[in-house]
UniProtKB/Swiss-Prot annotation:
Subcellular location: Membrane
Gene: Pon2
Organism in which the protein naturally occurs: Rattus norvegicus
GO CC term (a single one): plasma membrane
Name used for this protein in its record: Serum paraoxonase/arylesterase 2
Carbohydrate-modified residues: N254, N269, N323
Length: 354
């Protein structure tokens, strides 16, 4: 009888593991292949060879790139090279990417930038918020952008127990932000287990010098985050659930879920066109190819444009798709004056004139 019970439990356990494995492949879109949707006036950006995971653009056309991300389980073309922040002036006739100097005293050797966000204060001071993973830990760095010197002055490093696995950040004040945790745990094995079992424990946290609190939870893997031009709504990409969540910002900075937009792809970072409110999304058509890198079958890239997301029938347009022959692993797409920038997790970046 005891052996029968043991065999029954073993069978149930194996069946559960098998079901979870198949479910994970579905969440990763592991069987998806794509056909290219090209744009005519595009070129690869010189000087970006190891990824531009996130991009943020100021109203004056200065674009910031976080480059050189190293992440457990992800391929890297330069595993020993520190990351950095690059800048490109999109108002120039032939814009080029330049690396920004960082103030003395900041640990550049372990700089591993991930999601970024800018904030302009009432006195026109520009702050750059950077999710950083020094030695695969989790911090948010706040810099002051010094345009005359093309440099960043490091102001503050933020660590908190509610920020165990930070992915992206949207600044809402000089020391205030919302951040996504793509996992509940910080330990790599527990992260893997959390993903495999689809526990949906990822969340969004609000940080200010006065308080830090959980404001939204129940995500499979909360990834990109951004805010509407009128500052009333926060958008969160749930990458493994293929969803964008629309959350209404409350006076106390809590978030209330308003709606969920289902998409058939892995949605990464979200960028907002300030003039129209359109959401531009860098996507991964096949997530398995990101983690099992094969140069003969590289990860593909996809850019979506979402219009009128607050309406009953938002418009979703596929702007660009590439099978990896040009661009591998697109993580962000952002627009400025009909100029489109597309960044990737660990490869190149694309500049297009629409």
């Amino acid at each position: 009888m005891g052996r029968l019970v043991a065999l029954s439990l073993l069978g149930i356990g194996l069946a559960l593991l098998g079901e979870r494995f198949l479910a994970l492949r579905s969440r990763l879109k592991a069987s998806r292949e794509v056909e290219s949707v090209d744009l005519p006036n595009c070129r690869l950006i010189k000087g970006i060879e190891t990824g531009a995971e996130d991009i943020d653009i100021l109203p004056n056309g200065l674009a910031f790139f976080s480059v050189g991300l190293k992440f457990p389980g992800l391929h890297s073309f330069a595993p020993d090279k520190p990351g950095g922040i690059l800048m490109m002036d999109l108002k120039e006739e032939k814009p080029r990417a330049l690396e920004l100097r960082v103030s003395w005293g900041f640990d550049l050797a372990s700089f591993n930038p991930h999601g970024i966000s800018t904030f302009i204060d009432d006195d026109d001071t520009v702050y750059l918020f950077v999710v950083n993973h020094p030695e695969f830990k989790n911090t948010v760095e706040i810099f002051k952008f010094q345009e005359e010197e093309n440099s960043l002055l490091h102001l503050k490093t933020i660590k908190h127990e509610l920020l165990p696995s930070v992915n992206d950040v949207i600044a809402v004040g000089p020391s205030h932000f919302y951040a996504t945790n793509d996992h509940y745990f910080s330990d790599p094995f527990l992260k893997y287990l959390e993903t495999y079992l689809n526990l949906r424990w990822a969340n969004v946290v609000y940080y200010s010098p006065e308080e830090v609190k959980l404001v939204a939870e129940g995500f499979d893997s909360a990834n990109g985050i951004n805010i509407s031009p009128d500052k009333k709504y926060v958008y969160v990409a749930d990458i493994l659930a293929h969803e964008i969540h629309v959350l209404e910002k409350q006076p106390n900075m809590n978030l209330t879920q308003l709606k969920v937009l289902q998409l058939g792809t892995l949605v990464d970072n979200l960028s907002i066109d300030p003039s129209s409110g359109d959401i531009w999304v860098g996507c991964h058509p096949n997530g398995q190819k990101l983690f099992v890198y094969d140069p003969n079958h590289p990860p593909s890239s996809e850019v979506l444009r979402i219009q009128n997301i607050l309406s009953e029938k938002p418009s979703v347009t596929t702007v660009y798709i590439n099978n990896g022959s040009v661009l591998q692993g697109s993580s962000v797409a952002t627009i400025y004056d009909r100029k489109l920038l597309v960044g990737t997790l660990y490869q190149r970046a694309l500049y297009c004139e629409l």
